């Protein structure tokens, strides 16, 4: 996937989740 410039180590994907990104290997991917 495409990295969404947001990490999800301590908290889930927030802003980028609205753009269809999901957590994978502690990084939000689209």
From Swiss-Prot:
Expressed in leaves, petals, petioles and roots but not in runners (at protein level). Disulfide bonds join 4-21, 8-23, 13-28. PROSITE patterns: CYCLOTIDE (PS51052), CYCLOTIDE_BRACELET (PS60008). The keyword RNA-binding does not apply. Keywords: Disulfide bond, Knottin, Plant defense. One of its GO terms (biological process) is defense response. This is a cyclic peptide. The presence of a 'disulfide through disulfide knot' structurally defines this protein as a knottin. This is Cycloviolacin-O1. It comes from Viola odorata. The lineage of its organism: Eukaryota, Viridiplantae, Streptophyta, Embryophyta, Tracheophyta.
């Amino acid at each position: 996937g495409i990295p969404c410039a947001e990490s999800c180590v301590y908290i889930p994907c927030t802003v980028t989740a609205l753009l269809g990104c999901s957590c994978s290997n502690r990084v939000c991917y689209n």
